[in-house]
Amino acid sequence: MKYVIGLDYGSDSARAVVVNAETGAEIASSVKYYPRWMEGKYCKPTINQYRQHPQDYIDVLEYTVKDALSKCPAGTAENVVGIAFDTTGSTPVFTDKNGVPLAMLP
């Protein structure tokens, strides 16, 4: 069988789903809240300002994909043929000349 992984980045969390590419059946899924979002960092609700840190995107990507795959039958990971990303909107990221997000610099 062949599988695909879908990742959905929302305002406060991200979700990963593993789907059978031939039937469309959902095999497993996982959700994780952005750690820095949950700590209230980079957000100012009084002025409707909500931001995410790039490391949160990486952290939840690693967690949700591994977690979803851990719930699948053995051999699923070796048969993933595609991965797709979805976001709630545009997420501009300021980078240095090498393309590294400024928030990731020491």
Identify the residue ranges that each predicted region occupies:
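N-terminal glycine/serine-rich phosphate-binding loop of ATP-dependent small-molecule kinases
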Residues: 1-104
